[in-house]
Amino acid sequence: MEYIDRFGLLGPQMTLGHGVWLNKRDIQRLAETGTCVCHNCSSNFRLRSGVVALNKLEAAGITSAVGIDEEGINDHRDMLQEMRMVLRVHRVPGMDDEVPTPAQVFRMATSDGAATTTFADTIGALEVGRAADMVLINWRDISYPYLDAETPLLDAPIARQDQRCAYRDI
């Protein structure tokens, strides 16, 4: 961390991937500079690289996102699976840290995830003027919700009509 800090690379425009080997001094410096961290939980397990001290980052005020790294590491690019893993992996017996809440993990996947990108002002929340950053889930078939071919969300206003989703491409 000290090495990249010497070059002035830390700051709000920098997002560090994984963050599993950060020490107390590193965490303090990330907080001071506004540097973000992207927690790639399933990737860390596949690589056997460690578990990020997520709530230490949270306590320090560091913006943390949920990431999936890449398909070769995550298998399915399934963000819901990744969110479940982040929620559960920090609930290991014997860990002294507080556990993340569902609301915290949801924030990491939405608004905090957006904050770690250059699109922070246009994604990450359902607000007027922002891109539709959402997913529709058919709870009867939740195996792979990202493969839902029935309701693609591509810059289209969505409405309900006769118990079905209707949208108009713009």
Residue ranges and their predicted role:
Residues 1, 24-31, 48-57, 74-91, ...:
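Histidine/acidic-residue-rich catalytic or RNA/ligand-binding cores of hydrolases
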Residues 38, 48-49, 56-82, 117, ...:
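Short acidic/histidine-rich active-site segments
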